[in-house]
């Protein structure tokens, strides 16, 4: 039994048995998508978010258990590990409390208190703390000698010992934490000599800023930390010093007298020199961690929405990477996304070869039977889209605007060089734009998520936590959609449950040598793909047109026999059962409940039989900007215009309204009600109507509102 399951269940308000089962599955090497989809009976129908939370809590407790081992060994080596202390450490599962217990025993550089102890002044410190001595100077004379020069040095050494004792006391530390928790203020000031630098102006909002720490939003905190890292700001966190020292003195100073005065001075020193910097650092780290976590959640959710954007599907596409002086790079792709042709046209100034460009586009559309166009949303996007929509092609061709974020990163990457070794970066970039329209998920997994541009301060947060979270999102999205085993790239297969880079490469090589897979069971012939990997991956891989229709569904091979029994009971084949919706409705799934298979799995199976291999991403929608607005100068306050949500943050959503500068809908302007999180109201790439409320031409800032629309 996992030693942490009880604590995890209590912390997450989950069934202890479900947590125990989930931890067992994780220990066996099962992936989160597999557990969530195919082990619902064991987990109590937990979704991926809950399973992830269980896994993270388990890792946290494991790390704490390791830390305890280190602490116990260190204290044991000092010969100071009493039975009572060991029990306290064994029973402690709060990281801050654990470090407080350890603090007095923690090896540290030679402190003033240690020097004083070496001088034999510990008894004097204890005497002063008792506060019964009427003449502390007289008591201190007994300690003057070879190591202590005079009474003043003796008393100072004793105060140093008291200060360290106070600073390492758990109750003292918790008192100061309480004051910081209640009233800590975060303050940001500009570094005077850098105030007029151009780059510093990005942080002008924080040149003289202060706010209660508990009310400071993650984006403001990260902005200040970025300004501090760049050398433009000084950021500090502080509480009410007087309130802190008063609280400490109430505990340590009893009455009035010379001893009490000395102890009071030691307490002041303990707070100013030791406690205050320590707790400030602790709260700075905690606030940074909290801000990081919030920013990572925002980025992860944005990435999920981007990856799960609706695909155009397998259609012949012409991709256009628009530009002025360097022309528009075009790439024609077949229905599988293979590059069949590319060239450059110059419809815009300075070359302005509009007629030749139009003729070239008509020729390519006719020759390669283009069904849709994908235009990158960068420079000259608006002008290019309008030009293409004006061309009278021989057959209808829909024009879509596609995000270019990260396309240049992909075009120079190792993956792109391997795919197109003989093409330059401009061609690779255009191909990526076209493929994003066809299947955003399959193309975006090739790009570092941080380059996609849908987060807030993603380069400032904990990079290892960010990578872990984003990898988890990519894996979740890939497996929730499912992957075509016969067309998926090696990179896409890498994210399938149970595979990884090596098995993904082996699958592609097997496919190249042996032709397309005709059944899932063929996967067992792939080198190094053993029973465990097969169990984890099979349900997420699809084979359109397979002899067994279940091979193109999310029904796991381990449940094929169950579906065969259902079909047999109805007197039909599995294929007939899949095709006959009326027949499916006659099945009473309760008859098939067993020790291994419960209602959650049976419900999932019936949903798959109804729509096998259904892509959950929906259908792509066309969008057009307001034709009368082409530049920020065209905007007027009060205008209502269409836009596309390009980024979502904690403080609002950015919307592209076709003027080369995204406008901001602040969270307070998102609805006619209170909105705590913008993602409650909008989704990435959603088409919205917005009202212009402010236009700052100098700073190129646009304020928008969605209220009363």
Located regions from the model:
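Long, highly charged, low-complexity intrinsically disordered interaction regions
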Residues: 4, 62-80, 90, 409, ...
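Short flexible coil/turn linkers enriched for glycine and charged/polar residues
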Residues: 15-16, 28-29, 95-96, 109, ...
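Short, ordered loop/turn segments at secondary-structure junctions
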Residues: 38-40, 129, 240, 322, ...
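Duplex nucleic acid-engaging cores and interfaces of nucleic-acid transaction enzymes
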Residues: 50-53, 60-319, 325-423, 430
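Structured, non-catalytic alpha/beta "coupling" segments that mediate domain-domain communication
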Residues: 74, 88, 98-101, 227-240, ...
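Short beta-alpha junctions and helix-cap segments that line functional grooves
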Residues: 317-319, 329, 385-388, 519-522, ...
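Single-stranded RNA-binding regions, centering on S1/OB-family and related RNA-binding modules
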Residues: 543-709
């Amino acid at each position: 039994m996992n030693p942490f399951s009880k604590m995890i269940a209590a912390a997450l308000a989950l069934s202890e048995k479900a947590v125990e089962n989930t931890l067992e599955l994780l220990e066996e090497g099962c992936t989160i998508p597999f557990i969530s989809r195919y082990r619902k009976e064991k987990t109590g129908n937990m979704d991926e978010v809950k399973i992830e939370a269980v896994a993270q809590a388990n890792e946290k407790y494991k790390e704490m258990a390791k830390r305890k081992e280190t602490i116990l060994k260190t204290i044991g080596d000092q010969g100071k590990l009493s039975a009572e202390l060991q029990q306290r450490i064994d029973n402690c599962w709060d990281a801050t409390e654990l470090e407080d217990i350890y603090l007095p025993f923690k090896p540290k550089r030679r402190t003033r208190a240690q020097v004083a102890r070496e001088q034999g002044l510990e008894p004097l410190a204890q005497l002063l703390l008792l506060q019964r001595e009427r003449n502390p100077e007289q008591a201190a004379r007994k300690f003057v000698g070879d190591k202590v020069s005079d009474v003043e040095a003796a008393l100072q050494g004793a105060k140093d010992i008291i200060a360290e004792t106070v600073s390492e006391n758990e109750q003292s530390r918790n008192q100061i934490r309480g004051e910081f928790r209640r009233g800590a203020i975060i303050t940001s000031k500009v570094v005077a000599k850098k105030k007029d630098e151009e780059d510093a102006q990005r942080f002008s909002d924080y040149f003289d800023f202060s706010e209660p720490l508990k009310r400071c939003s993650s984006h403001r905190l990260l902005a200040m930390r970025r300004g501090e890292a760049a050398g433009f700001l000084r950021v500090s966190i502080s509480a009410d010093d007087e309130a802190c020292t008063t609280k400490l003195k109430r505990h340590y100073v009893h009455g009035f007298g010379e001893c009490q005065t000395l102890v009071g001075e030691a307490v002041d020193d303990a707070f100013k020199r030791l406690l205050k910097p320590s707790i400030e650092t602790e709260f700075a780290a905690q606030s940074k961690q909290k801000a990081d976590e919030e920013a990572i959640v925002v980025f992860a959710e944005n990435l999920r929405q981007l990856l799960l954007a609706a695909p155009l599907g397998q259609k012949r596409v012409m991709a256009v990477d628009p530009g002025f002086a360097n022309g528009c790079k075009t790439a024609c792709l077949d229905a599988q996304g293979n590059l069949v042709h590319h060239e450059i046209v110059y419809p815009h100034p300075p070359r302005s070869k509009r007629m030749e460009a139009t003729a070239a586009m008509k020729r390519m559309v006719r020759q390669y039977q283009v069904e849709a166009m994908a235009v990158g949303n960068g420079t000259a996007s608006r002008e290019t889209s309008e030009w293409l929509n004006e061309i009278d092609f021989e057959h209808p061709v829909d024009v879509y605007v596609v995000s270019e974020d990260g396309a240049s990163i992909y075009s120079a990457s190792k993956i792109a060089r391997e795919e197109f070794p003989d093409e330059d970066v401009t061609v690779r970039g255009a191909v990526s734009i076209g493929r994003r329209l066809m299947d955003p998920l399959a193309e975006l997994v090739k790009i570092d998520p941080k380059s996609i541009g849908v987060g807030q301060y993603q380069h400032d947060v904990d990079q290892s936590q960010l990578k872990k979270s984003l990898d988890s999102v990519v894996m979740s999205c890939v497996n929730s959609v499912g992957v075509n085993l016969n067309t998926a790239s090696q990179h896409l297969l890498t994210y399938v449950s149970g595979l990884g880079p090596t098995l993904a490469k082996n699958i592609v090589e097997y496919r190249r040598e042996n032709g397309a897979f005709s059944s899932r069971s063929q996967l067992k012939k792939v080198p190094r793909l053993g029973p465990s990997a097969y169990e984890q991956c099979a349900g997420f891989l699809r084979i359109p047109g397979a002899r067994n229709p279940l091979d193109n569904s999310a029904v796991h091979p381990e449940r094929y026999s169950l579906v065969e029994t259902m079909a047999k009971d109805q007197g039909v084949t599995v294929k007939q059962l899949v095709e006959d919706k009326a027949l499916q409705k006659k099945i009473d799934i309760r008859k098939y409940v067993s020790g291994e298979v419960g209602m959650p799995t049976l419900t999932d199976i019936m949903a798959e039989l109804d729509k096998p291999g259904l892509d959950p991403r929906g259908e792509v929608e066309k969008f057009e900007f307001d034709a009368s607005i082409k530049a920020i100068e065209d905007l007027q306050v009060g205008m209502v215009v269409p836009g596309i949500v390009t980024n979502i943050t904690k403080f609002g959503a950015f919307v592209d309204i076709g003027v080369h500068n995204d406008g901001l809908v602040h969270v307070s302007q998102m609805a006619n009600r209170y909105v705590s999180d913008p993602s409650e109201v909008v989704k990435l790439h959603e088409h919205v109507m917005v009202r212009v409320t402010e236009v700052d031409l100098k700073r190129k800032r646009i304020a928008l509102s969605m209220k009363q629309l």
